[in-house]
């Protein structure tokens, strides 16, 4: 029998600067013993937004407080880009990038005890970096969270 457990979306990073708003959310999952995250990176701006494309070589790198790195690999060989959309009502350009990334079995142990201070998406169109805050008071979601302990808290929920 197969088993899948999926946690709810949590906001990891939010940026509101000038005409541009962006945010990153993670949804952790475990499917038949494989641990991964579904991420979504949304950008909204009155200005032009540069496209981001991910492919089979794209990785997500988590920089931990102890100096170690945890790397996640893309779950697909397909190239995916955040296509430009236009919100005519609010006159905003929108780009949404989604992806599924897996941990290798041996490399997520440190996430049980170490805070994450930087998340880097190594895309084929260039790296995207997120400096992770200890506390996030989201203006978009109207929530408060502790993104740097996301993995410490949520790995427990999956019984890992």
Pin down the residues of each PLM region.
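Internal interaction segment
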Residues: 72, 76-160
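Short coil-to-beta strand junction motifs in C2/discoidin
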Residues: 50-58
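Short amphipathic, basic-aromatic surface patches that mediate peripheral association
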Residues: 39-51, 107
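Short, surface-exposed loop motifs enriched in S/T, G, D/E and P with embedded aromatic residues
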Residues: 1-3, 66-78
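Short, solvent-exposed beta-strand/turn "edge" segments of beta-rich domains on protein surfaces
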Residues: 25-34, 49-51, 88-90
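Sec-dependent signal peptide cleavage junction
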Residues: 1-28, 44, 157-160
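Short conserved beta-strand and strand-loop elements enriched in small hydrophobics
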Residues: 58-63, 119
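Glycine-centered tight beta-turn/hairpin loop motif at sheet-sheet or coil-to-beta transitions
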Residues: 65-67, 125-126
């Amino acid at each position: 029998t197969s088993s899948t457990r999926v946690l709810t979306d949590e906001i990891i990073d939010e940026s509101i600067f000038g005409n541009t708003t962006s945010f990153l959310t993670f949804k952790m999952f475990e499917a038949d013993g494989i641990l991964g995250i579904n991420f979504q990176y949304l950008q909204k701006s009155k200005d032009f937004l540069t496209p981001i494309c991910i492919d089979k070589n794209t990785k997500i790198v988590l920089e931990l407080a102890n100096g170690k790195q945890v790397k996640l690999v893309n779950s697909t060989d397909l190239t995916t880009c955040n296509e430009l959309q236009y919100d005519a009502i609010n006159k905003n350009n929108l780009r949404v990038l989604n992806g599924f990334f897996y941990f290798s079995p041996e490399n997520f142990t440190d996430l049980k005890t170490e805070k994450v201070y930087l998340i880097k998406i190594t895309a084929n169109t260039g790296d995207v970096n997120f400096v992770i805050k200890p506390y996030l008071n989201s203006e978009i979601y109207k929530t408060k969270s502790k993104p740097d302990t996301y993995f410490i808290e949520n790995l427990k929920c999956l019984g890992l």
